Amino acid sequence: MKRIHLVAAAVSVAISWSAFAAEGKHEHGHGHKPLHGGVVVDVKDVDYELVAAPTLIRLHLRDHGKAVDVSRTTAKLTLLAGNDRQDVDLKPSGGWLEAAGTFKVAPGTRVVAVVTTAGKPAATVRFVLK
């Protein structure tokens, strides 16, 4: 009988946690809205905003709502559009990471970014373009 109560309690906690997570509420006091017209993904309290155009890609980083110094940061993107795959290296440019060229960035394109900052472990960020 105790096992049934334990399982029921565990299921109840799991359902409560998923409902809380689905609401989009965050304890850290900032939202994840795009500031530059891109797609935002949060990984370990850092917001990564990918702004992708056919000739320019930018990646903006914010930590708890404040811009991150990207002077020692690089990123390697993999763009996946249907059967097409394209690798893109982003370098610091002003307060963001950037690459110029010709890119396939249609809605639905999946992007995997590996972001590396000196002295820190790399972060893997996944986007789906809108």
Name each model-derived stretch.
Residues 9-15:
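Hydrophobic helical h-region of N-terminal Sec-dependent signal peptides
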Residues 2-5, 16-130:
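Intrinsically disordered, low-complexity terminal tails/loops enriched in metal-binding residues
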